[in-house]
Amino acid sequence: MQQNILKHQLKELGQKLLAKLKYKKYFRKTSLKQKDVGEKFLNEIASKNPKNFLEIGVFHGVTARNVCELLYSMHKNDFKYVGLDLFGINDETSNEIIPNTKFNNPLKQIYFQYILNQDPYSLEAVTHLLKKFKNNVHLIKGNSNNLLKKMDMSKIDYVFLDGGHAYETVKNDLENSLPVLDNNGTILCDDYNLSYAPGVKKAIDEFVLVNDFKIEILFDYRFAKIEKK
């Protein structure tokens, strides 16, 4: 009983702290740039009060930084963030839909290329962005098709899935994340309604149907939240 009360109090505290948090872009590219989407995303995460967070598809690390700020506001240093990404374009991305890594703003291009001398999509650049939380963050470079099989997913209580958009990749990522759901965790999938990547929706719908999970479509059909019934 006391444990449930404590969880409720922590959840309320996290949501109060969230009111002071805004989804910041940190002078980088992010897919959550549309009005209020970032704040809604953070609010959704806060409602679950996770401590062990996995992001599949880190890109420039903007969402990672926002998530770490949120988790710190709720748990101080008692949280863990794990991020998987290829951190670059190579042969493994040839069949994938990769976000445009070039800036529309020439000032940002100059800043990264000539001042920081960094590729913002590199492991080095993302590590630099997250250095404030270096003791809480574990970034892993590689293909999720291979990496997830080697991870102890039972320790993760929240997955944000925004990696490869090919049907087989999404299917694989979801299947390897099953232990998270078995432990009453949450998987939040981005780009559920992405018209030029129909494999995302197909893989999610099949996964939910086969396993008889609960699915909730959020924010104008953009996100699919999967949990046990």
Annotate each language-model stretch with its function.
Residues 2-49:
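Class I SAM-dependent methyltransferase Rossmann-like catalytic core
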